[in-house]
Structure formats: C-alpha cells, structure tokens
UniProtKB/Swiss-Prot annotation:
The keyword Signal applies. One of its GO terms (cellular component) is extracellular space. GO terms for biological process: antimicrobial humoral immune response mediated by antimicrobial peptide; chemokine-mediated signaling pathway; positive regulation of cell migration. InterPro entries: Chemokine_b/g/d, Chemokine_IL8-like_dom, Interleukin_8-like_sf. GO terms for molecular function: CCR chemokine receptor binding; chemokine activity. The keyword Signal applies. Coiled coil: none annotated. Residues 1-24 form the signal peptide. This is Protein K6. Keywords: Signal. It comes from Human herpesvirus 8 type P (isolate GK18) (HHV-8).
Length: 95
C-alpha cells in the first residue's frame, strides 16, 4: 500500500486537473482554442478582472466559453447564459 502522503499528492493533482479546462494538445498554460469545459461558473465574475475570451472546441461534449483573467486564470462559462453573452460582447476574443 502506498504511503498516505503519496495518496494525498495524487488526489490533489487529480482534483487540479479536473477543475482546470483541459487542452486537447499542448501545455495547460497556453491559450489555444482547443480546450473543453466540464463544469461552468454559475455567477458572473467582476468584469474588471477579465481580459479576453475564447470558445471551446466544437469537438467538446458541451459548448463553452473560456474567460481569461488579467492574472491568467481560466474560467469556464456557459455561452447560453445572458451574462456570458454580455461579457463576450464587451471583451475582445482571442482569434
């Protein structure tokens, strides 16, 4: 049986990857339009912290929008929500 600290580290890593938008190729840090969202932010973040956005890949199981903050954080949002569409109009899109 593996030591408890190893199991804890593995659990933390798995949770981190599950909650981060996934990339179909490349680094998690790069902002390529190949990411998928498996859960969505329920409430709008303050527009002051946001920088830009890009859509998820059409190959993803759910359509989504990834909002990028000025600090580099990625937030998954549901493009069918009114607040998300309003942010998409206000913020520049990544081509």
């Amino acid at each position: 049986m593996a030591p408890v600290h190893v199991l804890c580290c593995v659990s933390v890593l798995l949770a981190t990857f599950y909650l981060t938008p996934t990339e179909s190729a490349g680094s998690l840090v790069s902002y390529t339009p190949n990411s998928c969202c498996y859960g969505f932010q329920q409430h709008p973040p303050p527009v002051q912290i946001l920088k830009e956005w890009y859509p998820t890949s059409p190959a993803c199981p759910k359509p989504g929008v990834i909002l990028l903050t000025k600090r580099g954080r990625q937030i998954c949002a549901d493009p069918s929500k009114n607040w998300v569409r309003q942010l998409m109009q206000r913020l520049p899109a990544i081509a």
